[in-house]
Amino acid sequence: MKEISVFILMLSLIIGCNEYSTEISQEIGSVKEEPSDFFTQESESSENTEKLFDFSKESHSEWFLVNDDVMGGVSQAQIQRINQSVMSFSGRLSLKNNGGFSSVRSFLPESALASFDGLTFKIRGDGRLYSVLVTTQNPRISWQSEFETNEGWQIVTVPFDEMRMSVRGWKVENSPKIVGSKVTGIGFIISDKIQEPFNLEIDWIAAHEDSG
């Protein structure tokens, strides 16, 4: 974890806040103390897919917003169900008060993704860059993977081993990998610093297990 220690030191020098750097260090340390299976998981040689959210069944009510107001920002967002089948995550980012992100999230039962290797979802966007994220029991630490959108429907597949750790928005290079057995939350986040309206429509979300 030498790279993470270097990252923490550089962060402290850049923002001039030793207290904040120490707090992030403690949170990353809590991950280091997890059992080794937190970072490694063997896959069975069979294909398996399980639908997690189908928004034709009103499961949008299980989702909630986490915006930059948690740190004083003023970005705005909303969740809607449209056409009785799609969840719309829309709003407008603002960079005021060092803000600039908005996210929509939901919880998952513990170990619900234990036998899976990643996520697959059907979305339609607006040409902007979003990230899919997963969280563990420490919601301040997430694992994220960016994906581009366009105005047409897309099916995106993201393996867990391609996700990278983020601590309160700070990306951690050479971070440990996340595995499905530790995932307790899922979400989407936009943080491209563009102060214009955004809209991401989500049809369904599934967990997948690689075959082979």
Where are the regions a protein language model picked out?
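Bacterial N-terminal signal peptides
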Residues: 7-14
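Beta-rich carbohydrate-recognition modules and glycan-binding surfaces
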Residues: 17-212
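Positively charged n-region of N-terminal signal peptides that target proteins for export
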Residues: 1-4, 18-19
